[in-house]
């Protein structure tokens, strides 16, 4: 199962999506952003994220396997 992390300060949730990228979502507003594990932004309204958490969530073996399967 993919890792999901809730940021203790911002409240944003970080989770790996179906193609191995990290979806960052603000549960309060529904805004989101899609990033790779290095912090490169792909889409969405959110552009300012915690790069350390992107790495923790996006560099798991599960996330890597999804990226390889979808590339």
State the predicted function of each range.
Residues 10-12, 33, 49:
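Short non-domain terminal segments
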Residues 2-27:
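N-terminal acidic leader/helix
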Residues 22-42:
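N-terminal glycine/threonine-rich, aromatic-flanked beta-hairpin/loop signature
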Residues 35-71:
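Mixed-charge, Lys/Arg-enriched low-complexity segments
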């Amino acid at each position: 199962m993919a890792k999901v992390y809730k940021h203790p300060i911002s409240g944003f949730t970080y989770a790996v999506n179906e193609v191995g990228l990290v979806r960052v979502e603000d549960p309060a507003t529904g805004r989101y952003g899609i990033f790779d594990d290095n912090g490169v932004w792909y889409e969405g309204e959110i552009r300012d994220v915690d790069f350390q958490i992107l790495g923790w969530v996006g560099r798991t073996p599960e996330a890597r396997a999804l990226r390889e399967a979808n590339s």
